[in-house]
From Swiss-Prot:
<comment type="similarity">
    <text>Belongs to the eukaryotic ribosomal protein eL15 family.</text>
</comment>
<dbReference type="InterPro" id="IPR012678">
    <property type="entry name" value="Ribosomal_uL23/eL15/eS24_sf"/>
</dbReference>
<dbReference type="InterPro" id="IPR024794">
    <property type="entry name" value="Rbsml_eL15_core_dom_sf"/>
</dbReference>
<dbReference type="GO" id="GO:0022625">
    <property type="term" value="C:cytosolic large ribosomal subunit"/>
</dbReference>
<dbReference type="InterPro" id="IPR000439">
    <property type="entry name" value="Ribosomal_eL15"/>
</dbReference>
<feature type="compositionally biased region" description="Polar residues">
    <location>
        <begin position="193"/>
        <end position="204"/>
    </location>
</feature>
<dbReference type="Pfam" id="PF00827">
    <property type="entry name" value="Ribosomal_L15e"/>
</dbReference>
<dbReference type="GO" id="GO:0003735">
    <property type="term" value="F:structural constituent of ribosome"/>
</dbReference>
<dbReference type="InterPro" id="IPR020925">
    <property type="entry name" value="Ribosomal_eL15_CS"/>
</dbReference>
<feature type="compositionally biased region" description="Basic residues">
    <location>
        <begin position="172"/>
        <end position="182"/>
    </location>
</feature>
<keyword id="KW-0687">Ribonucleoprotein</keyword>
<keyword id="KW-0689">Ribosomal protein</keyword>
<dbReference type="GO" id="GO:0003729">
    <property type="term" value="F:mRNA binding"/>
</dbReference>
<feature type="region of interest" description="Disordered">
    <location>
        <begin position="172"/>
        <end position="204"/>
    </location>
</feature>
<protein>
    <recommendedName>
        <fullName>Large ribosomal subunit protein eL15</fullName>
    </recommendedName>
</protein>
<dbReference type="GO" id="GO:0002181">
    <property type="term" value="P:cytoplasmic translation"/>
</dbReference>
Amino acid sequence: MGAYTYVSELWRKKQSDVMRFLQRVRCWEYRQLPSIVRVTRPTRPDKARRLGYKAKQGYVVYRVRVKRGGRKRPVPKGIVYGKPTNQGVTQLKFQRTKRSVAEERAGRKLGGLRVLNSYWINEDSTYKYFEVILVDQAHAAIRNDPRINWICNPVHKHRELRGLTSAGKKYRGLRGRGHLHNKAPPSRRANWKRNQTLSLPRYR
């Protein structure tokens, strides 16, 4: 077995004494640093490589801190409108994953880079930490690499904001295949619109 097999096995056994200690120490360090910070190399090299990372020019990794918990509805001055059944503020569930939020924040802060993928690295009672892999689409090493230069196409600008990354497709419900998943694509909204539209074809 290769080295990455052992590394991934370490990360599978997160409750071992060594990993518990390591994760607690790392979490303390992450809390002292800004919410978005660049890291010199991935914390989980096996996971990063599986998701497309290469240790070459043009690839960068950023660690992003996201607050845990539900999403509170923004109601200015506490004014809610509509019927009482729809006036909830606090018990609402955000429809997107924390990982997709981390990708969005990294993509907004680093507008000149393209978000490739992301993965979980740590969490405590208050925050979750993710590492986001970004690609510099203007770098010659990226533009000349046939395995990654697809991301240089302008249609991939801010793919993280449009639910086109792996995390985005997951919260959109596009992971499944087959007859049990024919309501999810192309989107939940499109499916709702199709079902609500009355079609009256003219007979000739």
